[in-house]
């Protein structure tokens, strides 16, 4: 309660002060009289006047009272130019900083909650360009002094930066007003102090840093390209390296705009998602789910039975699913769309030239106005001692290695409890493997809230999976033809024997062999890009897993639009990649879907929120389907229906999430979802009931009391 009370008190002080000033307005003639009296008093109280003046100026600016202009003039009249200039410069900056800190203390929580996830992106912009913005605003004296103080206080700008930039930015304006104050007795009005030409001059001076920045960037760009000869004509408008989720969309968009585009792929069209990731994993998840339903058919009033799992036939179905989808991403389809598809290894020779070592033999060099790197990612294998000896599997290799096995691996270790490891662990357990899931973190699916991890882990354990969290793998080996892995937990080492091990601890971008190092393009965990997905060279862009920060197929396609449009039309208009609403799902049983903030993320970032939770065990359709487990959890701005984040755990969570993704993207609140008809009986009603739970928690009790009395009166 302290903050609201303090805020109300400060507002009352400011309002009363303003009302008093309006009742006794200050004009130039009154100021001149006050100054003449103070000049006489100054003769015997010089230092006291300096201290009182400085304190008064600080209070006026800290409380945002409309007296700063008059006090600046008075400084020139009382103390002369240099002493007045120094006094005003420091006092105004100190007062402004106090107002800045007060706004941060009193209002920042409210603003964080109101802006939600956008607050983080605003602060990123302030961290990068905040000093430039502030300097520009300070240089233009007609912009409200108090407004700048309050607005900047709501950002993450450091107080020290604010003080220094404010003081430097206000020097010119301070000098003008203090100098005018030295001639206060001769002034007839304030209009001559800040004339239109002077305001324009200040504005131009304020814009100078931005102009200088543009010039510097232009010079840097010219320097970057200086070692290369730009072609006078180009063979292509765009060359895309990689035909995965991002590369295919890039090529599709470019062809749709009638650009001449070449798509280069070194391995399989469709990339990891089609051939090793999303599609094959979902195919095996479905087979595993059917096997589980057969074992538990009594849930549906049927006789349970143990399914006969011929693992090679399951893998044959996986291959067939991939083959059925492959035409969507095929060379023929994209050729028919107008894309030139070349199969081979691409290497960027210079900013406008790509050399392709063709699988069919020979090499081909093409010049291009723009290049998009969309080379994807590959499984990361930790450098454990002995890991190569045991013959580990990854999400890339397991499909081919295990395709002819009649049975699933009897003893399977899955290293990593993230989305990939979790999905594969449950699938293989349901298909007959004895699975041990090893996770170094304190819980599986660490990106989600703890209650999500707990619910999924309980499901895993019901499927017979041994879940070992907080266990660190330290070495692997083979003893008497038996493979093993050592893990450490609470300083104790344990040995686990296995027949096969799947490594699923993450994925690393493919960065080597494309000529990036030779061009000086920075690569770390990903290719370094700016907000427009441009690399060091503005005509070379990156999209998808290789660019980060997300590793989802749908995000790769999302980035592809920005990368392609910026590559083709960046000279006219560029677009910053928009990551404000990024959904994802983990297809375990139960499924987990999320968009926006989790509770843990909201707490870590200091964003105020309310939680509304609806248990799916209450949902009619879920009960009818014998799938009455899970929940819908919605985070909203306190007291408002604006959605900050949603987590859904339960059957078809990934599908149910789409309604909230749409709502967040287009600024629709829970009231809109509540007011939308949902078909009965469907799982989608869970979203509406969650919105209803929020509405019930925000019913106006006084209004209900009035309505109850109205009904009582109507009954007579």
Question: Where do the PLM segments sit?
Answer:
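Glycine-rich active-site loop/strand segments that organize a redox cofactor
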Residues: 281-319, 576-577
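Rossmann-like dinucleotide-binding cores of NAD(P)H-dependent redox enzymes
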Residues: 320-327, 331, 400, 408-413, ...
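FAD-site-proximal beta/loop scaffold in flavoenzymes
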Residues: 388-406, 495-573, 658-659
């Amino acid at each position: 309660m302290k903050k609201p009370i303090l805020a109300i008190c400060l507002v009352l002080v400011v309002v009363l002060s303003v009302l008093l000033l309006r009742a006794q307005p200050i004009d130039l003639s009154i100021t001149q009289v006050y100054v003449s009296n103070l000049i006489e008093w100054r003769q015997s109280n010089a230092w006291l006047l300096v201290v009182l003046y400085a304190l008064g100026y600080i209070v006026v600016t800290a409380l945002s009272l409309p007296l700063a202009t008059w006090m600046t003039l008075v400084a020139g009249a009382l103390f002369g130019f240099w002493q007045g200039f120094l006094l005003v410069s420091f006092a105004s900056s100190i007062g402004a900083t106090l107002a800045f800190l007060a706004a941060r203390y009193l209002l920042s929580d409210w603003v964080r909650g109101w802006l939600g996830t956008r607050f983080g992106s605003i602060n990123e912009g302030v961290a990068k360009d905040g000093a430039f913005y502030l300097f520009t605003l300070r240089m233009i004296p007609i912009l409200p002094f108090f407004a700048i103080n309050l607005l900047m206080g709501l950002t993450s700008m450091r107080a020290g930066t604010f003080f220094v930039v404010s003081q430097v930015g206000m020097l010119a304006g301070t000098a003008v007003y203090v100098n005018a104050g030295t001639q206060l007795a001769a002034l007839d009005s304030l209009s001559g102090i800040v004339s239109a030409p002077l305001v324009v001059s200040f504005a131009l001076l304020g814009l100078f840093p931005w102009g200088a920045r543009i010039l510097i960037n232009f010079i840097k760009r010219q320097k970057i390209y200086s070692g290369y000869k730009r072609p006078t004509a180009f063979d292509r408008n765009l060359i895309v390296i990689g035909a995965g989720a991002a590369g295919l969309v890039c090529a599709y968009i470019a062809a749709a705009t009638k650009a001449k585009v070449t798509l280069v792929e070194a391995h399989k069209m469709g990339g990891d998602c089609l051939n090793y990731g999303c599609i094959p994993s979902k195919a095996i998840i479905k087979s595993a789910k059917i096997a589980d339903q057969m074992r538990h058919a009594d849930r549906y009033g049927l006789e349970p039975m143990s399914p006969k799992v011929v693992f090679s036939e399951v893998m044959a179905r996986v291959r067939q699913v991939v083959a059925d989808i492959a035409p969507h991403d095929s060379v023929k389809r994209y050729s028919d769309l107008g894309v030139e598809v070349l199969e081979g290894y691409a290497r960027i020779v210079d900013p406008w030239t790509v050399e392709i070592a063709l699988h069919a033999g020979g090499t081909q060099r093409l010049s291009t106005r723009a290049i998009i790197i969309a080379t994807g990612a590959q499984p990361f294998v930790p450098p454990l001692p002995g890991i190569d000896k045991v013959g580990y599997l990854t999400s890339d290799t397991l499909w081919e290695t295990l395709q002819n096995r009649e049975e699933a691996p009897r003893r399977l270790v899955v290293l990593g409890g993230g989305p990939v490891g979790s999905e594969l662990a449950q699938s293989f357990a349901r298909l007959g493997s004895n699975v041990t899931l090893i996770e170094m973190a304190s819980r599986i699916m660490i990106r989600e809230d703890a209650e999500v991890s707990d619910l999924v882990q309980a499901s895993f354990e019901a499927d017979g999976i041994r879940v070992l969290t907080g266990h660190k793998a330290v070495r692997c080996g083979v003893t008497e033809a038996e493979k093993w892995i050592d893990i450490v937990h609470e300083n104790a080492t344990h040995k686990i024997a296995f027949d096969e091990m799947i490594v699923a601890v993450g994925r690393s971008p493919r960065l080597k062999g494309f000529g990036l190092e030779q061009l000086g393009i920075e690569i770390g965990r990903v290719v370094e890009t700016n907000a427009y997905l441009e690399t060091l060279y503005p005509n070379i862009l990156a999209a998808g897993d290789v660019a980060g920060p997300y590793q989802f197929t749908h995000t790769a396609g999302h980035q592809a639009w920005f990368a392609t449009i910026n590559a083709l039309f960046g000279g006219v208009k560029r677009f910053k990649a928009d990551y404000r609403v990024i959904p994802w799902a983990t297809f375990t049983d139960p499924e987990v879907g999320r968009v926006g903030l989790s509770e843990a993320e909201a707490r870590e970032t200091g964003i105020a929120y309310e939680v509304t939770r609806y248990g799916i065990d209450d949902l009619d359709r879920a009960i009818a389907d014998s799938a009455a487990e899970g929940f819908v959890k919605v985070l909203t701005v306190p007291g408002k229906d604006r959605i900050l984040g949603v987590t859904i755990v339960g059957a078809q969570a990934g599908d149910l999430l789409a309604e909230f993704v749409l709502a967040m993207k287009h600024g629709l609140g829970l009231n809109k979802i509540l007011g939308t008809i949902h078909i009965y009986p469907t799982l989608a009603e869970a979203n509406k009931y969650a919105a209803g739970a929020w509405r019930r928690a925000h019913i106006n009790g006084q209004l209900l009391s009035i309505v109850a009395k109205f009904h009582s009166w109507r009954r007579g």
